[in-house]
């Protein structure tokens, strides 16, 4: 299908224009009003990556009927951020569509999924004929390859509008697929150029994305990203990244440290991110770190957890440790965090005295004479 030909569009149908950067060039494109029934969601949309993977893992197939297909994806768009959709829908209802979307000539939406969703819902609700159309740029699907389209998506996501509503796990999945999986679609340098990030930030995101993959492998749920979304592991993974990047930890035991930290994601309750952060000073104290890992090995905690995950039904969406394992991990973590706090408190008077002596030694006694 070619929308331009199918709808017999010409210059008289142009309602506005939109500037886009594609294939390294900035161009001004015409914007048309397209009937909603000719349009289709993009199931490769990074915003709903975890929902798509869950849908497929559960054994479902996408319908070839465009309306049924769109109904499935619409539900994912709404679930991913209902508040943002509600705001977009309300704005469109009051002001109409103010920002043009971007679609391919085959009808697949590249940018504007939430606007499309809002219009579909308003149209179904009988809000008015004006909501039966999406205003969008139409790009020739034969002219641009997947990399060109992905580059455009990144440019739109990180350009004028700050996309703060992007689920952090879906973002990590997107980074993994764009930069790591099968060699990546982009080099880190190319990605930096499209996202307005520094190369250091891009490489950090890559390492955290890889930690997400490692974590899911550790719990024997490889690439089941929706589990990570449900567990809200973004904060804990970022703390783990900080710990593993510390030059104070013993690099010889880096893998054991990482796996023990992964177990804490599963075992700790409350503010997991903060509680994992507290382990940083423990692992930076090499003596305490060694003692903790020796205790973990002696109690066979990591071995027991590996066996536990291997015995769980891989198809099970809920991943929880047994109460016995949770208690083992919690008590070990709490013991060493408290020991480190006690050690710091005990050393504080000595540190204060050293600072005092240093200050006294720096006093110019001749100036006092």
Language model segments and positions:
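Short, charged/polar connector segments at secondary-structure boundaries
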Residues: 1-130
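Helix-turn-helix/homeodomain-like alpha-helical modules used for DNA recognition
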Residues: 27, 56, 242-297
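Amphipathic, charge-rich alpha-helical segments that serve as recognition/docking helices
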Residues: 76-77, 124, 128-217
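Short runs of predominantly hydrophobic/aromatic residues within well-ordered alpha helices
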Residues: 115, 172, 188, 233-237
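Amphipathic alpha-helical "recognition" segments
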Residues: 127-134, 198-270
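Charged/polar low-complexity intrinsically disordered segments, enriched in acidic residues
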Residues: 287-369
